[in-house]
Amino acid sequence: MKVGIISLGCAKNQVDTEVMQGILENSNYKMTDDYYDADIIIVNTCGFIDDAKEESVDHILEVAQLKETGKLKVLIVAGCLSQRYQESLKEEIPEIDAMIGTDTQDKITEVISSALKGNYISFYDRLNKIDEQLFLRQPYQPGPSAYIKIAEGCHNYCSYCAIPLIRGGYRSRTIEDIKIEANHFIEKGSKELTLIAQDTTNYGSDIYGKFSLDTLLDELATIPGDFWIRVLYAYPTRITDSLIEVINRHEKICSYLDIPLQHIDDDILTSMNRGGNKEQILNLIHNLRKNIPDITLRTSLIVGFPGETDEKYQNLISFMQEIEFDHAGIFKYSDEEDTQAYNFKDKVSEDVKEQRYQEAWEVQKEITRKKNEGLVGTEMRVLIEEALEDEPTTKVGRTEGHAPEVDGAVIIPDCEASSGDFINVEIVQALDYDLIGEMTNEFS
């Protein structure tokens, strides 16, 4: 039996996809990227915002058509959308043969067996321990970087976010189990471990009684080998002095931090139930740049939140221009059922949201371009990821200031290095988001 998996959404969802792929390969299923040739297709969905939900539904409908045009026998929907819309999704798309939620990847073979017999089945149990599944992971995409999910769920309950409803409360993995998985990836040749969770800085609070990301990083940095460790999804009020010290002390830990702030106006932050205020955020950024002078900072920002007046929006733009984040993701507020913000008044019109979204992107593009221009003439260490398909001698890589998938890249023509090699590159040209470089040394 041939199985295809379509993975949508965030890196955390990709890890879930890799768990299912590993379980299936271990059970002698053959994986395929040719969906017309697949007997079974799993769509691992995202249900975070409207655009993501629409993309997930579109993929499900496209796959459903393969029951007529391909050899498809079974369509399985997994992930956030199936967890959130357990009953209505099957009613609206009857071609779905089975559904599993965000915590039941270990049931995938049982689900397939039942669906092949013509029996509809679904699993939505909430697990407290998922480590055994994670050890079976198989990479969904080729490359030298691996995501390490250090926790599942969230208990921040931001007013606009449905993730706690979808993925449950915060559950940390143990340091021992994470270190075993990290060792596994390094032994298989990974050159970058990217730590992810809904909130990485809350790591350990549930099982160790205190924020323990600093301790985890200390342990991971002792693993032998030449590789990077990167931290994404840090909550601003939980970035401790100890965490900053650990990031600065270890050469393996990238001088990089992703801190989703969402906004800077104090009234909006309060409405978002974010915790913290503008003054605390400014002090944090000052502290980070003072103690890690070469740090790269990324953030995520939401425009068009209910109650965002022109003045409050301009506060956000002024903040972006003052702080000059190296990278930023800009998102339009999306009404999500069953969240506090869904019932808020003073909604911002779609036209105004779109206008603010476009303007904020332009502001950030100019900032990133200026930052990139400042790198021209410098020499940087680059991790090679892949070759361009139509130009195999042109390689694409990233510096420690570029997280996988979400930030820019370094393009290196006439380069003999291979995926997974670290090389030194002189930056010769700056683009809006990417850099052009020339290799200056033998690769390793």
Swiss-Prot record:
GO terms for cellular component: cytosol. Its main location: cytoplasm. Binds 2 [4Fe-4S] clusters. One cluster is coordinated with 3 cysteines and an exchangeable S-adenosyl-L-methionine. It catalyses: L-aspartate(89)-[ribosomal protein uS12]-hydrogen + (sulfur carrier)-SH + AH2 + 2 S-adenosyl-L-methionine = 3-methylsulfanyl-L-aspartate(89)-[ribosomal protein uS12]-hydrogen + (sulfur carrier)-H + 5'-deoxyadenosine + L-methionine + A + S-adenosyl-L-homocysteine + 2 H(+). [4Fe-4S] cluster 1 binds at residues 10, 46, 80. [4Fe-4S] cluster 2 binds at residues 154, 158, 161. Residues 1-117 form the MTTase N-terminal domain. CDD domains: Radical_SAM. It is found in: Cytoplasm. GO terms for molecular function: 4 iron, 4 sulfur cluster binding; aspartic acid methylthiotransferase activity; metal ion binding; protein methylthiotransferase activity. HAMAP family: MTTase_RimO (MF_01865). Belongs to the methylthiotransferase family. RimO subfamily. This is Ribosomal protein uS12 methylthiotransferase RimO. It comes from Natranaerobius thermophilus (strain ATCC BAA-1301 / DSM 18059 / JW/NM-WN-LF).
